[in-house]
Regions:
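Flexible coil/turn and secondary-structure edge motifs
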Residues: 1-4, 8-176
């Protein structure tokens, strides 16, 4: 899930880019990219659970990644780009495990789901130039999004599983 995908979503209050899961304190982007810190690039989401549930956020997450690739994501290769869900308590862990199992059972993907579900550890905020990157450099972000293969991957796996808006419009009354 990128910042671009998490905002604006009703109920999401704040999204911060950063690093987590490793053994180096206060890692820099360069250190994380070296693949030697054990950290993954991640985002930390603050949300209002009266408006959006953890499960709903997970459903959004699954539709932004390739959960079958344990070597990174699209154009970003290396363990620091592997997908993971970091949980903060047993309830989140169970919801995440159920969500992953549901995705696996859906057979949307031909390969095994390899996204890890692991306890949250200290989160280190990324440098300022990595915050809101999609807003600061929209052209670069959009070129990467399409050029990396992510756009086509997401479209090919999820468009058929989304509501056909034109068909839905036919069922609505004029007031709706």
């Amino acid at each position: 899930l990128s910042l671009h995908d998490a905002l604006p979503i009703y109920g999401v209050i704040k999204v911060v880019s950063g690093y987590t899961g490793g053994h180096v304190e206060n890692p820099t982007y360069q250190e994380v990219c070296s693949g030697t810190t054990g950290h993954l690039e991640a985002i930390q989401i603050t949300y209002d659970d009266d408006i959006i549930s953890y499960d709903e956020l997970l459903n959004i997450f699954w539709k932004q990644i390739n959960p079958t690739d344990d070597g990174g994501q699209f154009g970003d290769r290396g363990t620091q780009y592997k997908t993971a869900i970091f949980y903060h308590d047993e309830e989140q862990k169970n919801i995440a495990l159920e969500s992953r199992e549901h995705l696996e059972n859906s057979k949307i993907f031909d390969s095994k789901i390899v996204t890890d579900i692991i306890p949250a550890t200290k989160f280190y905020e990324a440098e300022e130039n990595h915050q809101d990157y999609y807003k600061k450099r929209p052209l670069n972000y959009n070129m990467y999004y399409k050029g990396s293969g992510r756009y086509n991957f997401v479209k090919s796996h999820w468009d058929g599983n989304n509501i056909n808006r034109e068909e839905l419009k036919k069922t609505l009354t004029p007031i709706q």
